[in-house]
Swiss-Prot record:
Keywords: Flavoprotein
Native organism taxonomy: Bacteria, Pseudomonadati, Pseudomonadota, Gammaproteobacteria, Vibrionales
Family statement drawn from the similarity comment of this UniProt entry: Belongs to the bacterial luciferase oxidoreductase family.
Cofactor requirement: FMN
Native species: Photobacterium phosphoreum
Protein known as: Non-fluorescent flavoprotein
Subunit structure: Homodimer.
Length: 231
C-alpha cells in the first residue's frame, strides 16, 4: 500500500437470480480502488447549468466523480463540492477518512443546498466508505486497521497523526461481528437511512476469517433485501 492507494471497497449487493452468495463476493458488482482526489486517476468534472463537462484545466477542477455500475456519484470533499452535487441531485460518496461529525455536516449541507435549489432528493441514496475489521478482540481489530492505514494518515495528516488516526479508527468499523453490525445499523440511522455502504475488509490479516466475514455479511444483506422486498 502506498500513500495514494488505500483500499479496495467491494460493493456486495445481491442480484436477483444470484443463487450462490459467495459468487457475489468473488465477483463483486464493482471494485472501487479509492485514490487520493488530487491524483489524475479520478475524472474531474465541472458541472455547468445543463450537462457534465470534463475539464483538463486545474483551475476548472471542482469535484471528483465516481461511477459505480451505471450510477454517477460525487466524492464529498467539501461544502462547495456538496453544494454542486445537490444542485443536480447527484448522490455523494462519503470518505472513509472523514470522521462521522464531518460526514454528517456535509450531509446536512447537501440537504440544505437541495432545498435551496428546489431539488427533490427523496430517492437519492448516497454511499459511505467504511473500513471493517472483525475480531472478537476489539484491540486486535483496531491495531490491524491502524497498521493498514497509518502510512496514508502519516502522509496526509502528519501534524496530528495520533489524534487523526484514532478519530478515523473510531469512525470506521472494528470489533466483534455483532458489534460491527450494530455500529453500521446505528450509523445508517444517523444518516436518516439515506446511505448504502462501501465496505473494505483489506485490513483483516486472517484471510480465512476475512472471507468468512464477507460471506456472512453478504448473506445478511441478502436476507435484509428479501425481508424488505428490495430484490
Amino acid at each position: 500500500m502506498n500513500k495514494w492507494n488505500y483500499g479496495v471497497f467491494f460493493v456486495n449487493f445481491y442480484n436477483k437470480g444470484q443463487q450462490e452468495p459467495s459468487k457475489t463476493m468473488n465477483n463483486a458488482l464493482e471494485t472501487l480502488r479509492i485514490i487520493d482526489e488530487d491524483t489524475s486517476i479520478y475524472d474531474v468534472i465541472n458541472i455547468d447549468d445543463h450537462y457534465l463537462v470534463k475539464k483538463d484545466s486545474e483551475d476548472k477542477k471542482l469535484a471528483s466523480f465516481i461511477t459505480l455500475g451505471e450510477k454517477l456519484y460525487v466524492l464529498a470533499t467539501s461544502e462547495n463540492t456538496v453544494d454542486i452535487a445537490a444542485k443536480y441531485a447527484l448522490p455523494l460518496v462519503f470518505k472513509w477518512d472523514d470522521i462521522n461529525e464531518e460526514r454528517l455536516k456535509l450531509l446536512s449541507f447537501y440537504n440544505a443546498s437541495a432545498s435551496k435549489y428546489n431539488k427533490n432528493i427523496d430517492l437519492v441514496r448516497h454511499q459511505l466508505m467504511l473500513h471493517v475489521n472483525v475480531n472478537e478482540a476489539e484491540t486486535v481489530a483496531k491495531e490491524e486497521l491502524k497498521l493498514y492505514i497509518e502510512n496514508y494518515v502519516a502522509c496526509t495528516q502528519p501534524s496530528n497523526f495520533n489524534g487523526s488516526i484514532d478519530s478515523i479508527i473510531q469512525s470506521n468499523v472494528t470489533g466483534s461481528y455483532k458489534d460491527c453490525l450494530s455500529y453500521v445499523a446505528n450509523l445508517a440511522g444517523k444518516f436518516d437511512n439515506t446511505v448504502d455502504f462501501l465496505l473494505c475488509f483489506e485490513s483483516m490479516q486472517d484471510q480465512n476469517k476475512k472471507k468468512s466475514v464477507m460471506i456472512d455479511l453478504n448473506n445478511q444483506v441478502i436476507k435484509f433485501r428479501q425481508d424488505n422486498n428490495l430484490i
